[in-house]
Amino acid sequence: MKEPPSLLWGLDPVFLSHARLYIKDILELKESNQVPGIFFYKDHPIKQVDILGTVVCVREKDAFYSYGDVHRSTSGANDLDGLVQELHRQESSKAKMEIGDVIRVRGYIKVFRMQREVVASIFYKVDDPTLDMQIMRMLELPYLYKHAYDKPFILPEDMTNQSQEQPNQAVLQRSGLISLLSEKIMNFVKENTIYNFYLPELESMPSLLSEATNPHYITESDSNVSSSSREIRSLFKEAIHILLKRGIVYQKGQNKDVYYVTDHDKELHKLTLNMIKQDCSRQGHAEKGCHFLHILNCVQQDFGSCINEAILQRVINALEQNSDIVSTMEKYYTAF
C-alpha cells in the first residue's frame, strides 16, 4: 500500500494521537520510507502508542547512585533529610515493576538493535484488582479498530477535484504549508518558552516568515498573491487555528488578539491540580478519583468557558508526566 505524502499526515487524527494498538500489531508495523521513526498501520501514520498490559519479563540494568551529605546540626536539616528519604521510598515503590503487574505505557516507537521497542514518556502501575480497566480496554480496542484504524485515510473533499482522479495540487500545497507552519509555530513557542503572543509578533519572526513564503510550496500562478502581506496573514491565521483546535494555544477574556500557550500557563496548571486535590479528598471521589468531564466543568467555572476538552487534555497529560496526578481508571484522575 502506497504511503500518503508526509505533508498530509497531520490531517490524519490517528497520527496526532497515542494509538491504542495490540502489541502484536505494534511489532508488525511497517516503517515509513519517507521519515525515519514513523510507522504505518495500513495507511495510517503512527508515531506514538498507548499500551495497557501485564509485565511478563523484567530485565534490570546496573543501578547508579548519587551520594550527598547534609549538615545535621539543626532539626530543619533532619526534617529535610527525612522528607527526601520518604519521597525516595515512594518513588521507588511506584517505579519498581514486577512480573504480573498491570502497567500502562505511553511513548513513541523506536527500533534499537533490530528490535522494536516503545520509549516511554510516561508509565505507571495500574491498580486494577477487579479487572475493570483491562475489560474496558478489551472492549474499546475492537471499536477503535473498526471505526478508526481499519478504515482508510480519506482526504477531505476540498482536497480532491470533482472527477476524483487527481488531487488539486494548489490546495494540497497550501494545506501542506499551513500544516508545516503550525508545527513550526508550536516548536517556536516551546523552544523559546513563550507564555503568550500576538499574531503580528509571529509574523515578524524571520524563521517563521521564511517558512510562510517558502517558494517550494507556491505555484507560479499564485506566487504574487502568496508573497503579499495579506496572504501571509491568512496563512498564519489558519496555522494558529490548527493549534487552537488541538488545544496547544487558546484565547481568553475579551481580548481576542492575545494567544496563550497551554503548556506554559502555570496558572491554569496550578488551578487544575488544586481542583483535583480538593475534590479527591472528598468522599465521592476518594476511591476512583475525578472524571475528566467533572474536572473540565470545574475548571470552566473558575477559569472560563475558553477551556475546552483539547486544552484540558494537554494540561492533564502534563500533570501526569510530572507525576502530579495519576490515572486510576480510564478518564479518572487522582492527585497525591
Curated annotation (Swiss-Prot):
Record keyword Coiled coil present: no
Entry keywords, A to Z: Chromosome, DNA-binding, Nucleus, Telomere
Localization terms from the record: Nucleus; Chromosome, Telomere
Record region (Winged helix-turn-helix (wHTH) 1): 162-263
Gene Ontology MF annotations: single-stranded telomeric DNA binding
GO biological-process terms attached to the record: telomere capping; telomere maintenance; telomere maintenance via telomere lengthening
Chain spans, region Winged helix-turn-helix (wHTH) 2: 264-336
Signal peptide segment: none
A Pfam family: STN1_2
Entry superkingdom: Eukaryota
Matching InterPro entries: CST_STN1_C, CST_Stn1_wHTH1_sf, NA-bd_OB-fold, RFA2-like, Stn1, WH-like_DNA-bd_sf, WH_DNA-bd_sf
DNA-binding residue intervals: 49-126
GO annotations of cellular component type: chromosome, telomeric region; CST complex; nucleus
PANTHER family referenced in this protein's UniProt entry, alphabetically: CST COMPLEX SUBUNIT STN1 (PTHR13989:SF33), REPLICATION PROTEIN A-RELATED (PTHR13989)
Subunit structure: Component of the CST complex.
The family this protein is said to belong to: Belongs to the CTC1 family.
Protein role: Component of the CST complex proposed to act as a specialized replication factor promoting DNA replication under conditions of replication stress or natural replication barriers such as the telomere duplex. The CST complex binds single-stranded DNA with high affinity in a sequence-independent manner, while isolated subunits bind DNA with low affinity by themselves. Initially the CST complex has been proposed to protect telomeres from DNA degradation. However, the CST complex has been shown to be involved in several aspects of telomere replication.
Name listed for the protein in its UniProt record: CST complex subunit STN1
Organism this protein belongs to: Aquarana catesbeiana
This protein's encoding gene: stn1
